[in-house]
Swiss-Prot record:
Interacts with ODC and thereby sterically blocks ODC homodimerization. GO terms for cellular component: cytoplasm; nucleus. This is Ornithine decarboxylase antizyme. It comes from Schizosaccharomyces octosporus. InterPro entries: Acyl_CoA_acyltransferase, ODC_AZ, ODC_AZ_sf. It comes from the Eukaryota. Ornithine decarboxylase (ODC) antizyme protein that negatively regulates ODC activity and intracellular polyamine biosynthesis in response to increased intracellular polyamine levels. Binds to ODC monomers, inhibiting the assembly of the functional ODC homodimer, and targets the monomers for ubiquitin-independent proteolytic destruction by the 26S proteasome.
Amino acid sequence: MAFRNPMYQLSNVDDIDSEVLNSRFLSETKDDGFSRRRTTLAVCATKKDLYLYGTTPAGGAEWCSEVLERTRPRIAHKRQRRRHVPRWISDSFRTCLPSPSGKWKEQTANEGEGRVKSSWLAACDERIGIAEPTNYWHGIVRTEDDSSKTLYLIPETWEDVHLKEGFVAIIDLAAERLQCSKLILFVDKNLSALSYLVKSLHWVGFEPVPHLDCVDHVLFGMEL
């Protein structure tokens, strides 16, 4: 299934001027006849690095503002092919997501076999992706019955998850840009370092979320 939904690029930047740090702007640019919007979403400062989120166009990733491009001209634009959601991630979301009240039937074609598979998603669900330099997060933003929003996230690998710096920026993105009041992570139960990861998640502020239908993953949540 082609991943054609919003993707957020997390860039590790070590020298951004105050103009970028204070920016909350939206600019319109045209490329090949199409309008694209780029905006600075969230900046997280740590002792050594700055983590900057920016929207990216479908099919590729790029620095999120002209200001940043002028600040770091030596950084080349990074083009990527459109991502595909691995089947195990799709299955995890379909199995572990709470049943919404309003649903719609999503049909996805298997390009290799030409078959169509149907699954149920909430009509208000929004699929997103978060790209880090060494990892990629697949996510769903769900609007609950009380109009609050929850961000569900699952990484392609837990080996390169930066619990301190990366999660602070992800929490900032979820709360400030996506307007979510809760963040829930999917953690593979078969991880060799599961016990250490659980302790680290507790340290960051996550708590286990019971879910009887989730067989291969355990859920951890945080109120934002």
